[in-house]
Design a protein with these regions (language model features):
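N-terminal leader/linker segments that initiate helical-solenoid repeat arrays
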Residues: 2-104
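Short coil turns that delineate tetratricopeptide repeat
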Residues: 81, 116-117, 160, 200, ...
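TPR alpha-solenoid repeat register
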Residues: 86, 121-122, 165, 205-206, ...
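Canonical tetratricopeptide repeat
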Residues: 89, 124, 128, 168, ...
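Short coil/turn linking the two alpha-helices of tandem helical-hairpin repeats
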Residues: 91, 96-99, 126, 130-138, ...
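Residue-level recognition of tetratricopeptide repeat
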Residues: 92, 114, 127, 171, ...
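Structural signature of tandem alpha-helical TPR/SEL1-like repeats
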Residues: 99-107, 136, 141-151, 179-194, ...
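Alpha-helical adaptor scaffolds
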Residues: 130-131, 154, 161-232
Length: 284
């Protein structure tokens, strides 16, 4: 698959990612690639230019002209406020006017956050990338992880004491890592463990370690961490569904069904409930 085609296909994996602009739910739904698309790619890494070109190739002439005007105003603008306004307009355009515009919207949101340089805006933009890392194509995952890392690192510069940001940065290393670079994954784990050891009640750290356990296929460790989270936060939907996933992948069908059923109680979206019901039926 050519790089341009890969990016366009990857954009389809993020159809529900816009939910994160308005509030966190469970992770954005991923559409599974075909077997051919799922094969590891030996092509060079995707960069921001590739992302923007692939996204802009789907615009109509009027939309293209509008985007180009805004991008040109960023290049010409020598005043920070002008650049910030243009980035905010580009974020709004891709978020609100383009159904598959998550990637450029998230990118421009990050650029806006860098100009604002506030802990809140940097963390929000970084979290948007982090929340959608799992399950992506390797090349796209690397690009998204790099965006998240830079934003989290900037937020830590603003406030080095923010443990949630440190956990998020660790997560970006874990989920953006690759088998070719396992030291990055371990770097992320150590970042989060440092927080968890210092504060055993930090459920965000426990949750991220649980996700990391699934990522590394250490299901017993994942189950231990995620169980701790749902004991402290019984309505933590993502932890509940992820715990069900851990039991599912471990092969414990009874426990997987039990946790999937529990998760349904906190879901209002009929389509999501149907997906879970299909999974439960497959396990029975």
């Amino acid at each position: 698959m050519k790089k341009q085609q890969l990016i366009v296909a990857s954009i389809g994996l993020l159809l529900l990612a816009g939910l994160y602009f308005f509030g966190n739910t469970v992770s954005a739904k991923k559409i599974q690639p075909s077997p051919q698309e799922a094969k590891p790619s030996t092509e060079k890494l995707i960069d921001t230019k590739d992302i923007l070109q692939a996204s802009e190739s789907k615009l109509d002439p009027g939309q293209s002209a509008y985007v180009n005007r805004l991008k040109n105003s960023v290049v010409r603008g020598d005043v920070k406020s002008q650049q910030l306004k243009a980035f905010q307009q580009l974020t709004s355009f891709w978020r609100d006017s383009v159904p598959d515009g998550f990637l450029p919207a998230a990118y421009y949101l990050g650029e806006s956050a860098k100009l604002e340089n506030s802990e809140k805006s940097l963390t929000f933009a970084a979290q948007l990338f982090l929340n959608n890392l799992r399950g992506q194509y390797p090349a796209l995952k690397t690009w998204m992880a790099n965006q998240a890392k830079e934003l989290f690192e900037r937020a830590l510069t603003v406030n080095p004491q923010n443990d949630s940001v440190r956990v998020g940065l660790g997560g970006a290393y874990i989920f953006g890592g690759s088998t070719a670079n396992p030291q990055e994954v371990m770097q992320g784990v150590q970042q989060i463990l440092a927080v968890a050891r210092r504060d055993s009640t930090n459920m965000y750290a426990q949750f991220m370690l649980g996700l990391g356990g699934i990522e590394s296929r250490q299901f017993d460790k994942a189950i231990e961490r995620l169980t701790r989270v749902v004991q402290h936060e019984p309505a933590h939907l993502e932890a509940i569904i992820t715990l069900a996933e851990a039991y599912d992948q471990k092969g414990d069908k009874a426990q997987a069904i039990q946790w999937y059923e529990r998760g349904k109680k906190f879901i209002a979206n009929p389509e999501m409930i149907k997906e879970i019901d299909r999974r439960i039926k497959a396990l029975q």
